[in-house]
Amino acid sequence: MITLALSKGRIFEETMPLLAAAGIEVTEDPEKSRKLILATTRPDVRVVLVRASDVPTYVQYGGADLGVTGLDVLLENGNQGMYQPLDLRIAACRLSVAVRADYDYASAVKQGSRLRVATKYVGLAREFFASKGVHVDLIKLYGSMELAPLTGLADAIVDLVSTGNTLKANHLVEVERIMDISARLVVNQAALKLKREPIRRIIDAFASAIPTA
């Protein structure tokens, strides 16, 4: 049995064409089913649904043989014990700094002000601001980042941005682009040795179906 870890939402939806290229289709809609383990049209392949931030953990410790997760999750939480054969070029977005539209971020940085920054990417944010010599106090949040500048909790946020519509709707503007993000295929190293042929076939099928830029 080969177990693939996925999270619900955009990554799940955009992984489906890649699975189809490998001759694998999930037999139930995760949005309608309460099951966390989903069967597929291949009796030897199943999909487990976990939180996006937990995908690398399941793969690293052998709860899943393969997984699809964002580069942001891998960089923030570490990627030990995993093979990363493919950038799948799906779920593309960017990690950015955003502030209120009326906040002069450039002046604050130039003056050496100490900024309060809200984010769930504390490690990546710390590394980014340290590289620029900007002093920050980081506030860990798990969602609704846009509220932080609006309520005075923080001067800025570091979050994923796709279209920018959510920022615009909340009167925020993107002021720095930290990095581009996309989903990666990750594979448990022990599983790759023990189940080499079936896993290799899935990797090759994914590779052939990756969207072109």
UniProtKB/Swiss-Prot annotation:
One GO biological process term is: L-histidine biosynthetic process
InterPro entries per UniProt: ATP_PRibTrfase_cat, ATP_PRibTrfase_CS, ATP_PRibTrfase_HisG, ATP_PRibTrfase_HisG_short
Which EC number applies? Answer: 2.4.2.17
Q: Which reaction does it catalyse?
A: 1-(5-phospho-beta-D-ribosyl)-ATP + diphosphate = 5-phospho-alpha-D-ribose 1-diphosphate + ATP
Q: In which pathway does it act?
A: Amino-acid biosynthesis; L-histidine biosynthesis; L-histidine from 5-phospho-alpha-D-ribose 1-diphosphate: step 1/9
Q: Where is the protein localized?
A: Cytoplasm
**Any single Gene Ontology cellular-component annotation:** cytoplasm
The record's section on Pfam families has: HisG
* Keywords for the protein's UniProt record, in alphabetical order: Amino-acid biosynthesis, ATP-binding, Cytoplasm, Glycosyltransferase, Histidine biosynthesis, Nucleotide-binding, Transferase
What does the record give under GO molecular function?
ATP binding; ATP phosphoribosyltransferase activity
Q: What does this protein do?
A: Catalyzes the condensation of ATP and 5-phosphoribose 1-diphosphate to form N'-(5'-phosphoribosyl)-ATP (PR-ATP). Has a crucial role in the pathway because the rate of histidine biosynthesis seems to be controlled primarily by regulation of HisG enzymatic activity.
Q: How does it assemble?
A: Heteromultimer composed of HisG and HisZ subunits.
Q: Which family does it belong to?
A: Belongs to the ATP phosphoribosyltransferase family. Short subfamily.
Q: What is known of its domains?
A: Lacks the C-terminal regulatory region which is replaced by HisZ.
- What is the name attached to this protein's record? ATP phosphoribosyltransferase
Protein's organism? Variovorax paradoxus (strain S110)
* Gene label: hisG
